[in-house]
Curated annotation (Swiss-Prot):
Belongs to the malate synthase family. Pathway: Carbohydrate metabolism; glyoxylate cycle; (S)-malate from isocitrate: step 2/2. It is found in: Cytoplasm. GO terms for molecular function: malate synthase activity. It catalyses: glyoxylate + acetyl-CoA + H2O = (S)-malate + CoA + H(+). CDD domains: malate_synt_A. It comes from Streptomyces clavuligerus. Its EC number is 2.3.3.9. Keywords: Cytoplasm, Glyoxylate bypass, Transferase, Tricarboxylic acid cycle. One of its GO terms (biological process) is glyoxylate cycle. GO terms for cellular component: cytoplasm. This is Malate synthase. The active site is at R169, D454.
Length: 541
């Protein structure tokens, strides 16, 4: 730390968890306090700006590329910083929370990159926040091998050369970390806590390993938010004596407003940017959030009916690939969330074919890599990208100059021919309750109906219920979506779960709370910006 650093550290307000003192050292807490002092006020201003922009979208019912940044888009001369060697080849990336078992499995998976997730696939209990930091630090020092006490299975890292490169995803700007306050008494943003602790403890070690501190930035809504991250990176590197430009960040384009500012986001982060990623559920969730009162033309069908080949989704991914390659950045495709069944090979065969077709399409479209949720899908995705890339690390030379996407095409959401169905509504209720219940118990990555679901799934599920009710949607069976119908479905799901699980297991869960929270955010007249905010109030630990 520099001589000008404040002497007052951030204050821990949580009961101690194992090995907490290794993470929350005095110097680390001082670093967090300084991040908070310098950058939380700007974070707060940008969150307020989100609300103002939402109000503007509500008034106009549309979005457009920004006229004030047209010069950035028109300037052909600028590029993002070259990718470091460890991020040249990103053809398959695996995602998952940073618990010890996932850490070993992901690093050993054969994927080129592991997205170590502190965001949507991690419920932010204090124990999860601290243990995730410890898992990364232990992995970088090769002291993470362990034997599971329940299963007796041993987990051990392969040689360094065979391990995936870690790209860590902190929480989004909206989430607080209630267990840490600054000297001013203000609660620290979870994003600054996750980034700050990871960077403080591991940046130097990663450089010694020939890699670096690499991050995924979630839920950005504007280039001003990217500018804030860039300023944080510059400050953090200077404070710890890390060379400027060492950090690399990949931005998830998972909000509709960010889709209109992809070039500007890369420009703001150009010293540190390494790519953009195309999300799906959070992107659709963002469309509903921003255009929820824009009329029937913005009512989406069942979420599973909206594929990446829907015209408005294709416009988004085509523009992302073109933007990335024009500026020298990697374009990373979306998630394959299938979880293989150990009992039903037919389910696996059909799902693997679907994953293969999806990854074939992404590789053919010019993406440089893609995401999977399970190690068994790594070879499937790898085959798709190997067929296109061969021994090249990426295909950034495919500039896709033939692509031309208009502002209107990005929000032509009425293009899918599908319509809301009774099965889709029931699925939204069932998945919403099941996911929220697990999240409230501290689990953020949950296998539901053969898919690995995270908070984005719960967000799109509850948002669709809210949208269909408020739009007066009539399902394909002639039934109108009403609060009474949703309550009936939710009560039926609780009854089915009680019967399936048995009284003792059901009572040990948090099913009634999950049911109540889903109904609260799905049925309230006022749309909740994020499900995870009221859920965090109920999260214990």
């Amino acid at each position: 730390m520099s001589a000008s650093a404040p002497s007052r550290p951030a204050v821990v307000t949580a009961p101690a968890v194992p090995r907490q003192d290794e993470v929350l050292t005095e110097a680390a807490l001082v670093f967090l306090a300084e991040l908070h002092r310098r950058f939380t006020p700007r974070r707060d201003e940008l969150l307020a700006r989100r609300a103002r922009r939402r109000a503007e979208i509500s008034r106009t019912g549309t979005l457009d590329f920004l006229p004030e940044t047209a010069h950035v888009r028109a300037d052909d001369s600028w590029r993002v910083a070259p990718a470091p060697p460890a991020l040249q080849d990103r053809r398959v990336e695996i995602t998952g929370p940073a618990d010890r078992r996932m850490t070993v499995n992901a690093l050993n998976s054969g994927a080129r990159v592991w997205l170590a997730d502190f965001e949507d696939s991690s419920a932010p209990t204090w124990e999860n926040v601290i243990s995730g930091q410890l898992a990364l630090s232990d992995a970088y020092h090769r002291r993470i091998d362990f034997t599971d006490e329940r299963s007796g299975k041993s987990y051990a890292l392969r040689p360094d050369a065979e391990l995936a490169t870690v790209v860590m995803r902190p929480r989004g700007w909206h989430l607080p970390e209630r267990h840490l306050t600054g000297p001013d008494g203000g609660v620290l943003p979870g994003a600054l806590v996750d980034f700050g602790l990871c960077f403080f403890h591991t940046a130097r070690r990663l450089l010694d390993l020939g890699k670096g501190p690499y991050f995924y930035l979630p839920k950005l809504e504007s280039h001003q938010e990217a500018r804030l991250w860039n300023d944080i990176f510059l400050f953090a590197q200077e404070q710890l004596g890390i060379p400027r430009g060492t950090i690399r960040a990949t931005v998830l384009i998972e909000t509709i407003t960010a889709a209109y500012e992809m070039e500007e986001i890369l420009y703001e982060l150009r010293e540190h940017a390494s790519g953009l990623n195309a999300g799906r559920w959070d992107y659709l969730f963002s469309i509903i959030k921003n255009f929820r009162d824009a009329g029937p033309g913005f009512v989406l069908p069942d979420r599973n009916a909206i594929t990446m080949t829907a015209p408005f989704m294709r416009a988004y991914t085509e523009l992302l690939v073109r933007t990335c390659h024009r500026r020298g950045a990697h374009a990373i495709g979306g998630m394959a969330a299938f979880i293989p069944s150990r009992r039903d090979p037919e389910i696996n065969r059909a799902a693997f074919e679907k994953v293969r077709a999806d990854k074939d399409r992404e590789a053919a479209d010019g993406f440089d890599g893609s995401w999977v949720a399970h190690p068994d899908l790594v070879p499937v995705a790898l085959a798709s990208f190997d067929a296109v890339l061969g021994d090249r690390p990426h295909q950034k030379d495919r500039l896709r100059e033939e692509v031309s996407v208009t502002a209107a095409e990005l929000i032509a959401v009425g293009s899918p021919a599908a319509r809301p169905t009774a099965a889709g509504l029931l699925n939204a209720v069932r998945v919403g309750i099941r996911y929220i219940e697990a999240w409230l118990r501290g689990t953020g990555a949950v296998a539901i109906f053969h898919l690995m679901e995270d908070a984005a799934t719960a967000e799109i599920s509850r948002s669709q219920i809210w949208q269909w009710i408020n739009a007066g949607v009539v399902l394909e069976n002639g039934e109108r979506v009403t609060p009474a119908l949703v309550r009936t479905l939710a009560a039926g799901e609780l009854g089915a779960l009680r019967e399936t699980l048995g009284g003792e297991e059901y009572a040990a869960g948090r099913w009634q709370e999950a049911h109540d929270l889903l109904l609260r955010v799905a049925l309230d007249e006022e749309y909740a910006d994020f499900l995870t905010l009221p859920a965090y109030e109920r999260l214990t630990g």
